Amino acid sequence: MTQVTVKELAQVVDTPVERLLLQMRDAGLPHTSAEQVVTDSEKQALLTHLKGSHGDRASEPRKITLQRKTTTTLKVGGSKTVSVEVRKKKTYVKRSPDEIEAERQRELEEQRAAEEAERLKAEEAAARQRAEEEARKAEEAARAKAAEEAVSAQPAAAVEVAAAEPVAKPAAAEERKKEEPRRVPKRDEDDERRDRKHTQHRPSVKEKEKAPAPRVAPRSTDEESDGYRRGGRGGKSKLKKRNQHGFQNPTGPIVREVNIGETITVAELAAQMSVKGAEVVKFMFKMGSPVTINQVLDQETAQLVAEELGHKVKLVSENALEEQLAESLKFEGEAVTRAPVVTVMGHVDHGKTSLLDYIRRAKVAAGEAGGITQHIGAYHVETERGMVTFLDTPGHAAFTAMRARGAQATDIVILVVAADDGVMPQTQEAVQHAKAAGVPIVVAVNKIDKPEANPDNIKNGLAALDVIPEEWGGDAPFVPVSAKLGTGVDELLEAVLLQAEVLELKATPSAPGRGVVVESRLDKGRGPVATVLVQDGTLRQGDMVLVGINYGRVRAMLDENGKPIKEAGPSIPVEILGLDGTPDAGDEMTVVADEKKAREVALFRQGKFREVKLARAHAGKLENIFENMGQEEKKTLNIVLKADVRGSLEALQGSLSGLGNDEVQVRVVGGGVGGITESDANLALASNAVLFGFNVRADAGARKIVEAEGLDMRYYNVIYDIIEDVKKALTGMLGSDLRENILGIAEVRDVFRSPKFGAIAGCMVTEGMVHRNRPIRVLRDDVVIFEGELESLRRFKDDVAEVRAGMECGIGVKSYNDVKVGDKIEVFEKVEVARSL
């Protein structure tokens, strides 16, 4: 690279050398003569200085402002949108060199002030330490002087005793030295240490080799904290500080306590065990459960995994909210006698509803579809002996869960048994539900007016179920009644109220309402409607209620006759409006203080219900994954089911899901309470399902989709019909089997030759009937040697269609000439036979 001097640079830029040197000096460059060399970096520095001095720097902007504008759109309601414009403004300021220099000077001054303050502080500390040292020395001198005076003042006898015991005195002095170490001046300790150093025995090389390695005393924590260690000559040298965050491998497995709730994800479980999530996933794969890290595990699975990995498991309840709610619902008040809740149970068509109709002076049974009860009905009746609340349950086999709920919510069970029919399956089931709930049973032997009635047969049948009549020494009253004529109804009510007196039923009317959901439905005009039986306290219009995973304010209350009421006390059934959804039958209803608490608990229950449901569903899939491997896929009948009430929906789902076998199954892809809507029709279209409406109808939008897409939609009002139709559909999906029927057997007696057909077998029909143009088998020694078709059948040179047993005929077999005497010709037909479930 060519070197440029100041003189050459002045010629290039066309300026005098003196002026260029002056400018270079202003730029801070060290050049003083024209012969000095100018480097590229010095040229750049000179150029920057000249630009700044000629106004380029002043023309640069000192302040830059950046503006940013973003526009977003928010959706409000259905189709309305709102545009939101956000404007942001930022200003960047470029400081001048003077300001930067002033800032630097200020920082230097602050640093100097801090150093000065630190120095003054150190001087004060040193002065304070010197003062303390002088005070300590003065105190030690005073103590030594006092000790000398005390010794000189001792009597002569003490001096003689001290002289007589020269050995004991040094010992006492030593003890005094040990007790008062601070009295000895520091220089005396140094002298003693120096004397010991000179007088102690120094070991030889051999002794050093034989001697064990000396133990290293632990370093002083004070010295280590200062970062120094004591040197060989009493000085201090720098000590490398140890890493405070060092890690040591554990010598044994660490057992941790793992808290597991009702559900837990794989990642949370791994975090509690302090292992990687991948390790838990790998371990569960080895156990035969393929999972992902975010998968929810149920409590049992998580407990098994944690225990297998060697950790302690603590099962915790996540019901803090529920416990707070239960605590807030505690109420102390005066308890009064309440009316009994009586559930009428029994087999289908044994007259339960008819008996209730006579008691209520109503006609419910006449208006029921198919003459059978398909919902739980709740009524309260005022009698001469007091009020009684009745629950009427269905007797059909499909309504098992409904009957179980009726038994749980009741005080007394009236078991209706038809005198002309006897103990039936649902009668036995009702007895089991009542015994499981611990409820007393009153047996009503109905239809006693019929000539074929046999009450003794009823007693024998129920005694076998451990329901012993009172006259036999048991505790179950048997009352013969006739729902048609009203015979024995008063005696039945008297027996019920007598049982209620024995039970001593109590309730607190002043407490907040608490009860159970008997039934729920979705009304098109009023929304979700729940039939609630108040069990304790008083339910009032306007109360905030929590029902299972639903909540809401009671907007209106209706009694069983549809009349509006303002409040309902214990043992009163009411319909409430205002919930945010249709609760499940059997859910507990409680009155809470405010909407916030109700929403909080309801959302907690919804999340918990969803997690448990997902965990169980996935566990079921994992259990069946290997069982289903290698098997053909089942044929599935998809159904979208809508019902009028929640109880009927549950009963139908349970009954339909139980249909099917190893080849066909029913899958309810969607179900709900209320009419068939457009979304139901679209779901049926997407899943290739059949739409079933039980006591409900489709709206106009749904009907339009059904007609346009050709969907199959059916209405029902009797549970028998829907179950029978689904059974027929499943039977059709099974297809048919081909079965062979042997029509006849002919024995070959002789063989003839025909120019047209070849070998003709002269046969005697021994069994059945031989038909022409039917499939045949040729058997030789009872072994099939040919299978074909019977082409020609003649009798006395005449073609015939069939030949009966005991007659001779000639048989020509198509494409077969190896017929021999003694063969048997078996004629059969293939028939399609429909399969059944």
Curated annotation (Swiss-Prot):
Annotated region (G4), positions in chain: 446-449
Region feature (G1): 346-353
Ranges annotated as biased composition (Low complexity): 149-171
Protein family membership: Belongs to the TRAFAC class translation factor GTPase superfamily. Classic translation factor GTPase family. IF-2 subfamily.
Name of the molecule in the record: Translation initiation factor IF-2
Subcellular location(s) of the protein: Cytoplasm
Annotated ranges, domain tr-type G: 337-506
Pfam families the record matches: EF-G_D2, GTP_EFTU, IF-2, IF2_assoc, IF2_N
Basic and acidic residues: compositionally biased ranges: 95-148, 172-188, 220-229
Function description: One of the essential components for the initiation of protein synthesis. Protects formylmethionyl-tRNA from spontaneous hydrolysis and promotes its binding to the 30S ribosomal subunits. Also involved in the hydrolysis of GTP during the formation of the 70S ribosomal complex.
Keyword Cytoplasm: yes
PANTHER family per the UniProt record, alphabetical: TR-TYPE G DOMAIN-CONTAINING PROTEIN, TRANSLATION INITIATION FACTOR IF-2-RELATED
Main location: cytoplasm
InterPro entries: DNA-bd_dom_put_sf, EF-G-like_DII, IF2_assoc_dom_bac, IF2_II, IF2_N, P-loop_NTPase, Small_GTP-bd, T_Tr_GTP-bd_dom
